[in-house]
């Protein structure tokens, strides 16, 4: 049989938000995101079975078979190209939990997996099968580089890899023919065409600048600095994870009662928990600044991942009254309700790339006073999903952030439950268990009101 010819190339470049992510990826932890799929009745699931499932489903997601490569000088932004030597086995591994096993040990393994850099010469993802000490139970830890997908894009990947999705053609596991890599001349022509288009239509760029200023809260001038706290010190290479779970309908009801959103309720609870922890350390800031990602899209498709996310800075009073905190958050969010996410990322990307070029990026993020913490919230599937015939009992989100934010909060709704993963540098947050208990109490208080 004749070898099929390569298809004509599509010039698929990294976006402005992708460039910001790449500029940010210079610290002691990589810019990775991940998810832990806890499988019901996972006993008997082995790496060979996982490989068979993924061999059918990875072709559904183009990015999982593509590498991000730099282009020659004058040829524009980095380029996504098909990995002609793609080998699924390079992306798979297996770990058996040591005694006694359990959730805490699983979370430790997941933290190690997410904090391990991905091979830049391969498609930027990996999957690790984690089994119990005696082969009892299983979980799949999926790790993606943030440049490959944001939170919403990550959900599209999970959906494509789960059972019962994809077209009949995709279900056959047909591997697409790799496209020919564009030649330097083609890249240069396309890059200059884009530059000329931007020069001819400056209004588009101006609108993005204005939108970015609004996202960052800079439309009316420079914001107040975030308070200096013991939680904001340069972080190292290790992370520890803990988890808080609550019934999603209870949080939805609390949000409606306060005229807010689920995310507003979570941010209020996070601010209350952090304030309580800081008080136990002898600190009493009057407010905390929380960074919340906002996306320019509601959903994503497996063939359109990437990053389309900006940031929203929320200044939250640290009062004990949860109702007052929530009212403040709702009022701020409403003033920026018309903001379309993504503009701030484009602006910050320019700044971050300049800092990286001057070797000043890491000192900047290690001592920044823009935010105290991050809260990332993604709406997951409402129904229970499965993988390889095994029911996915829980999905635990994990993302690591660089700089001087020693604890961040990753939030995901799935099948009627709301899960908050606390991701902390254990050297700077040795009292993470206390913070976890405080957050659980704050969320319980929010839903009881």
Q: For the regions a protein language model found, what residue spans apply to each?
A:
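Soluble acyl-CoA-dependent acyltransferase catalytic core bearing the H(X)4D motif
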Residues: 2-17, 35-405, 411-440, 444-449
